[in-house]
């Protein structure tokens, strides 16, 4: 069948900011869809509110809108652009919900917009709990016993009938938002109320608990003729009860019999056919291992987190193919390597893929490390190996949590077996590590299965690793014999982990291993729907058959798993670097292990290595490919932490040197440089012990900002107000050494914070704009809203900031990107820190200032190889007629037990951008894009300190004119009334009633 000609202009709705449950996999799917549809000759209109995405780049679609994702804004875009098609199933839950809302409001009919890929009634059949249940009943496919509730009272009645525990699932949500497993009446009341609010239609499904059953997923693709293929079978290793986004899983299924897989496929095909999705669908099943009963849990009639994983696990680009099918092509029209065409595809890889989630409980004080039906993970890694053991151990070292194997985590080795078994009763992010120590202490496989419901196959594999580790320890203090070392490497033991186990330097193990000929081999995963594209994984269990070209090559190190402080912004930088290198005539190599990203898409680089970002893995790729150099400054802290060791091993680090990066982190060296340049910094000191810290505090005076060195996202940062607080902080600080001391700075209490990104060639430096933080000093820059260009910084101070930035970049010989953080107190500009690397604001500055920050930096970084002149002298400052406001998106809805106060430790998962011709509208749009509706009526509480009272009247007058009632405290109220503005006085808590 040929492509559709009844649509010419297609609107694609993005998924908005990165939140728990909806991350950069939708940037990956949206970018792929744009590529596919443009290639087929369609005009693309794209709308998304997230500036850190590749899909919102001006070159991805024909017309791009960075606007809030709600029905009103999209209606305005439809009215202006007049698309005749809408593709809703690539923008996650956000895209589907908006499509359904636009349909219900009659907008799509009014403007003649056809929905392609998935019909609106199909969305309702898949997403509406009642519709889905009725459809399953008509097909004779079993579901968990359940009933729908529209109120808490109804839910209580249903739970009584079904028996506790029950699962609550709100309709039209994702990431398990608002839902959960409840064991009693009180829990049900709390969770149900939350669920009814979270649901788009005020509907919650109350379902019998299938806790402990197997959770199995299929990714199915269907075309308009009804032809279906299964892309991937995914086995969740954690049982039901843990959200699939938090669950540890494998592809292919490792313990599920062939006949059961066939039955799952038969049922999945009947469901997908009945819902009539064109493109990818994720179908989730539960199976009771006692009696073999299979039930369907739910489907996602769209690309999802699982489809991104399935795509990367199999080499089948689901989003790309889904877009082509939505445009009218059929599976038999799309060529596919060895199968001929896609309709003949079967998943037949001879390797094992493991997905492991990355959590951020340490960022949320008071959060419970407990996994349930509500997703808590902020990122994930994927690893590929020839065996389960190899892939599993690769996944652990990919996580970047300071662990290179399963043993030695926290203090688990010191705990008695009974305590470890107790800890396993509640699933947590530490579950695999606790099990490992429990097995070491003699836990029985059957007992572990009864507690965790993790199948004996996986527990036995873990037991074999424990036994092998105990065997290895016999060689303590030396490199083991070749046969023992070879077996350890085949089972996935990392060089670094062996070094920790044996007390031998990692270097010695690496040299002995290479000398004995124990080296990684590489194999390609073919990409379906392409002629000869592939990406590569390593294994010690095969012969090397991959071929490295002799072209001029440059390697980019990616950012690894998403986490708070290091997310999609750094992937954006890596992708742009790859594009720029291709234009400069280099073959590009990317190393990364994050399945959600555009950087791990098969055609972003010339060669993709899906590998952990560790010294061992990067060095072996370097040895294989022999690139001219490696770029470490675009992937956040991950590659920077490797840079010095790579350089020691003869790797040419391009751009800013590891020594410069270390100097920026070393407070003494950096302060000496600022003194030399005559640039003010807040007084500071470095402490290794409590006594050091108290002595510094006495000298500088409280409040103080304290933090560890070498961290990203403000990990471990706090504002300390007294000696007692300082003692508590120092006692809790982990891994503090003279090399890595605690940094202590005077906290600039009433300062305005701002930052500047710069492009430098070591001599010439360009600063596109200064960003002003809207939140007060002390809130991490990643959590603060910011405005670009600045609004309240005097021209004089903007010039000072640009001058300081230029002088510092030149002095440090920065080659590439740099980010500078400043604070202005009493009209003095203080330098807070310098980051000689890409920062999370690079996509924001690139978009608002319309400047290709990363391509320019890439040109500079490669100048020694290309001999090209620097682009920096040609860059000119531009005047803006518009204003951009970035607002942070925070995940407190997923951490109900945490106090939602912001501080110097970053907690946001994503961001949105509001753009307009003036600050007010841009700020309004940014707030609107975070799904926080700004109130247009009601009562405003005003209470300000004396210093700010002079600016108060104008603000109060504005609120009064807008029709708001004003209540105010003491002196503030008198001042407002004195200006002729009505206000009601209210007391502070300690002053009496009525109070705040």
Where are the regions a protein language model picked out?
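ATP-binding N-terminal substructure of ATP-dependent carboxylate-amine bond-forming enzymes
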Residues: 1-141, 150-157, 394, 447, ...
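ATP-dependent carboxylate activation and anion-phosphoryl transfer catalytic cores
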Residues: 2, 27, 32, 39, ...
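A short, flexible beta-alpha/helix-coil linker loop
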Residues: 17-20, 121-123, 142, 172-175, ...
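Acidic/histidine-enriched active-site and ligand-binding environments that engage anionic O-linkages
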Residues: 157-167, 695-705
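Short, basic interhelical loop/turn and adjoining N-cap
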Residues: 452-459, 500-511
């Amino acid at each position: 069948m040929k492509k559709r000609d009844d649509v010419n202009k297609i609107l694609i709705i993005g998924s908005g900011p990165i939140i728990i449950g909806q991350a950069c996999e939708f940037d990956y799917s949206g970018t792929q869809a744009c590529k596919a549809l443009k290639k087929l000759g369609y005009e693309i209109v794209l709308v998304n509110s997230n500036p850190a995405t590749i899909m919102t780049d001006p070159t991805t679609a024909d017309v791009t809108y960075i606007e809030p994702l709600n029905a009103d804004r999209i209606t305005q875009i439809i009215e202006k652009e007049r698309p005749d098609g809408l593709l809703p199933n690539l923008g996650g839950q956000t895209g589907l919900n908006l499509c359904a809302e636009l349909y219900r409001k009659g907008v799509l009919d009014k403007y003649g917009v056809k929905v392609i890929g998935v019909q609106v009634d199909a969305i309702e059949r898949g997403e509406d709990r009642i519709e889905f249940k009725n459809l399953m009943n008509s097909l004779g496919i079993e579901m968990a016993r359940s009933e729908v509730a529209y109120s808490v009272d109804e839910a209580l009645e249903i739970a009584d009938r079904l028996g506790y525990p029950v699962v609550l699932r709100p309709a039209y949500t994702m990431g398990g938002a608002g839902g959960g497993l409840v064991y009693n009446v009180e829990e049900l009341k709390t969770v149900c109320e939350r669920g009814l609010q979270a649901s788009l239609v005020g509907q919650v499904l109350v379902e019998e608990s299938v806790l402990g059953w197997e959770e199995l997923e299929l990714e199915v693709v269907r075309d308009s003729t009804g032809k279906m293929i299964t892309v991937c079978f995914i086995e969740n290793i954690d049982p039901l009860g843990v959200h699939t986004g938090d669950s540890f899983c494998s592809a292919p299924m490792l313990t599920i019999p062939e006949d059961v897989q066939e039955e799952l496929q038969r049922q999945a095909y009947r469901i997908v056919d009945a819902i009539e999705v064109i493109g990818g669908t994720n179908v989730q099943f539960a199976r009771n291992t006692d009696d073999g009963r299979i039930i369907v849990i739910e489907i996602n009639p769209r690309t999802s987190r699982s489809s991104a994983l399935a795509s990367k696990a199999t080499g089948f680009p689901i989003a790309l193919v889904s877009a082509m099918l939505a445009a009218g092509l059929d599976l038999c029209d799309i060529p596919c390597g060895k199968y001929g065409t896609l309709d003949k595809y079967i998943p037949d890889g001879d390797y094992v893929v493991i997905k492991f989630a990355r959590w951020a409980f340490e960022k949320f004080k008071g959060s419970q490390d407990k996994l349930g039906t509500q997703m808590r993970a902020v990122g994930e890694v994927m690893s590929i190996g020839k065996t389960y053991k190899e892939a599993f151990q690769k996944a652990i070292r990919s996580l970047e949590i300071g662990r290179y194997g399963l043993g030695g985590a926290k203090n688990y080795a010191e705990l008695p077996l009974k305590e470890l078994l107790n800890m396993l009763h509640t699933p947590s992010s530490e579950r695999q590590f606790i099990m490992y120590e429990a097995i070491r202490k003699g836990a029985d496989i059957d007992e572990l299965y009864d507690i965790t419901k993790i199948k004996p196959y996986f527990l036995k594999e873990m037991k074999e690793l424990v036994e092998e580790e105990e065997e290895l320890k016999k060689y303590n203090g030396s490199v083991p014999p070749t046969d023992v070392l070879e077996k350890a490497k085949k089972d996935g033991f990392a060089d670094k982990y062996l070094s920790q186990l044996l007390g031998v330097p990692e270097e010695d193990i690496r040299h002995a291993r290479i000398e004995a000929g124990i080296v990684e081999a590489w194999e390609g995963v073919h990409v379906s729907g392409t002629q000869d594209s592939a990406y590569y994984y390593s294994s010690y269990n095969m012969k090397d058959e991959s071929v490295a070209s002799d072209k001029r090559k440059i390697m980019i190190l990616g950012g690894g798993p998403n986490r708070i402080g290091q997310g999609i912004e750094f992937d954006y930088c890596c992708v742009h670097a790859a594009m720029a290198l291709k234009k400069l005539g280099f073959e590009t190599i990317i190393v990364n292990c994050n399945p959600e990203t555009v950087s791990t898409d098969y055609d972003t680089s010339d060669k993709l290595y899906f590998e952990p970002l560790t010294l061992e893995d990067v060095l072996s790729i370097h040895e294989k490919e022999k690139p001219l150099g490696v770029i470490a400054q675009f992937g956040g802290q991950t590659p920077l932490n490797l840079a010095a060791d790579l350089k020691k091993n003869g790797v040419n680090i391009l751009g800013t040197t590891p020594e410069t990066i270390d100097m920026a982190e070393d407070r003494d060296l950096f302060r000496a440089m600022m003194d030399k340049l005559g640039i003010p910094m807040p007084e500071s000191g470095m402490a290794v012990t409590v006594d050091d810290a108290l002595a510094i505090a006495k000298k500088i005076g409280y409040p103080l900002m304290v933090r560890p060195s070498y961290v990203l996202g403000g990990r471990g940062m706090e504002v300390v107000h007294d000696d007692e607080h300082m003692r508590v902080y120092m006692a809790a600080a982990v891994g503090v050494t003279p090399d890595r001391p605690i940094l202590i700075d005077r906290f600039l209490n009433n300062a305005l914070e701002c930052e500047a990104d710069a492009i430098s060639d070591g001599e010439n430096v360009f600063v596109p704009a200064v960003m002003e933080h809207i939140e007060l000093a002390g809130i991490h820059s990643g959590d603060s809203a910011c405005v670009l260009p600045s609004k309240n910084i005097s021209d004089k101070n903007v010039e000072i900031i640009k001058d300081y930035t230029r002088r510092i970049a030149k002095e440090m010989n920065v080659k590439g990107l740099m980010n500078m953080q400043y604070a202005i107190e009493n009209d003095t500009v203080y330098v807070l820190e310098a980051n000689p690397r890409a920062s999370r604001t690079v996509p924001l500055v690139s978009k608002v200032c319309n400047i290709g920050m990363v391509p320019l930096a890439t040109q500079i970084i490669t100048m020694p190889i290309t001999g090209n002149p620097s682009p920096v002298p040609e860059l000119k400052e531009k005047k803006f007629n518009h204003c951009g406001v970035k607002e942070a998106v925070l995940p407190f809805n997923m951490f109900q037990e945490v106090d939602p106060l912001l501080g110097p430790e970053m907690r946001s998962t994503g961001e949105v951008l509001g753009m307009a011709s003036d600050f007010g509208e841009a700020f309004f749009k940014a707030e609107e894009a975070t799904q926080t509706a700004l109130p247009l009526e009601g009562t405003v509480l005003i209470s300000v300190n004396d210093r700010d009272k002079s600016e108060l009247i104008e603000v109060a007058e504005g609120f009064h004119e807008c029709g708001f009632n004003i209540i105010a405290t003491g002196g503030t109220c008198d001042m407002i009334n004195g200006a002729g503005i009505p206000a009601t006085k209210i007391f502070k808590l300690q002053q009496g009633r009525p109070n705040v």
